[in-house]
A protein has these predicted regions:
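Short, small-residue-biased leader/transition segments that mark boundaries at the very start
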Residues: 2-9
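A generic fold-level signal
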Residues: 4, 17, 63-64
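A residue-level signal for beta-strand positions that form part of recognition/binding surfaces
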Residues: 6, 19, 112
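Cytochrome P450
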Residues: 10-17
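Conserved C-terminal alpha-helix-loop-beta "cap" of PLP-dependent enzymes
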Residues: 26, 30-142
């Protein structure tokens, strides 16, 4: 391979190195450190799911066994394509603002948003601020 900087090539995560990322994380944080982080992130995701369920017009669309939450705002009067456009609009507002980074995806042919909580320094206050920003973006997209 001439002209290729092999130092810039990533490690192949095939059969032999599939668990390399996890191994590095366990070596850095230890098993107990990884457990603490996962428990915190799962608790934050479940807290957010409870807040979403408690808020009229908002739905959690799938179980939350780990730290990813699938949600959608379904205000009265919006259905099908209009609801899809609205969902994409408020998710885009959040992503452009930098308040969070959400992943729009389809579920049963309709757009929804995935929130994944897992950054190293994420605390409950960050998740609460994101929830407030999501509701504000949804309100602004509705106008």
């Amino acid at each position: 391979m001439t002209g290729v900087q092999t130092c810039a090539l990533p490690i192949s995560l095939g059969r032999r190195f599939r668990a390399l990322k996890l191994w590095c994380l366990i070596r850095e944080r230890g098993v107990s450190g990884l457990q603490v982080r996962l428990r915190r992130d799962i608790a934050n995701a479940r807290w957010l799911a409870a807040e979403v369920e408690r808020t009229p017009g908002w739905r959690v669309l799938a179980p939350v066994p780990l730290q990813t939450l699938c949600l959608r705002h379904e205000p009265p009067g919006l259905e099908d394509e209009a609801l899809d456009r609205y969902t994409l609009a408020w998710a885009d507002r959040i992503n452009r603002s930098g308040a969070g980074y959400l992943t729009p995806a389809t579920l049963d042919g309709r757009w929804m948003v995935r929130v994944s909580i897992g950054a190293l320094a994420t605390e409950r206050a960050h998740v609460d601020a994101l929830w407030q920003a999501i509701r504000a973006a949804a309100d602004a997209a509705r106008r």
